[in-house]
Regions:
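Substrate-gating cap/lid alpha-helix
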Residues: 185-222
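Short acidic/His/Gly/Ser-rich catalytic and metal-binding motifs that mark active-site loops
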Residues: 146, 184-188, 228-230
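A short helix->loop->beta-strand "cap" motif at the edges of active sites that frequently abuts
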Residues: 170-174
Length: 230
């Protein structure tokens, strides 16, 4: 049986393709590219010792790596302290489980504006293997795959490849993917392009959830983007 709703949607996108192309080019030409915030992109922090019985020999380091695109890089913030990584570190510092088992927090930020899943995968291949396994890798990806209209198959394969290299090369114990933002609501994207982009982002986000659910040690985090940048 033919899905008439799907056919109607495809036909609409075909008819509006010239409008999408014009609006996309105009956005690329007119949109101001915001700089990435200033600040350190790696560091080691001594944690308050909730468990004073931990000896120097037993003291371990909690290793955090934040990877991805402009959301991870902190675009829109003035400094890294105001950005995602700057807000995440104090939360981890005050976590009782981390305090009880670790003496230090070693963190690094590996993120660049405009990076797609392919760019992130390539970056992970180029980066040297860490001396110690990464306890948590937080990953933001998908916005630029959406705007570049990556195929569904390519997106799924590259997410699978990212998971594979993160676990194999970096020894990641917990990999957390942030959800894609609601791109249809972005004021910089005019109608009808916003609906097309929003629908594409929703498809990629659904696939991301499915891939995460199929792997041990991989989680999908629905993100409140308005709150994250406030």
């Amino acid at each position: 049986m033919v899905d008439t709703n799907k056919l109607t949607s495809v036909a609409k996108d075909v008819l509006l393709a010239p409008v999408y192309l014009y609006q996309g080019r105009k956005i690329k030409r007119d949109t101001v590219r915001l700089p990435e915030p200033h600040g350190e992109r790696h560091g080691v922090i001594d944690l308050p010792q909730a468990n004073n019985e931990i000896s120097t020999q037993e003291a371990k380091t909690f290793n955090l790596m934040v990877v991805g695109d402009s959301a991870a890089a902190g675009v829109g913030s003035q400094t890294q302290q105001e950005a995602l990584v700057g807000k995440l570190i104090p939360i981890l510092e005050q976590n009782e489980a981390i305090q009880a088992n670790f003496a230090r927090l070693n963190w690094s930020l590996q993120a660049t504006t405009g990076h797609t899943s392919f760019d992130i995968l390539r970056r992970l291949y180029v980066l040297p293997a860490p001396e110690q396994p990464i306890d948590v890798m937080l990953l933001s990806v998908g916005v630029n795959d959406t705007t570049s209209n990556v195929s569904v198959h390519k997106w799924q394969q590259q997410i699978e490849d990212i998971i594979n290299i993160a676990q194999r090369k970096f020894g990641v114990r917990e990999l957390v993917f942030l959800s894609l933002p609601p791109m249809a609501q972005m004021p910089a994207i005019p109608a009808p392009l916003n609906n097309f982009v929003g629908a594409k982002a929703s498809v990629l986000d659904e696939i991301l959830q499915q891939v995460c659910a199929a792997h041990d040690g991989v989680n999908y985090m629905a993100t409140d983007f308005a709150r994250m940048i406030s």
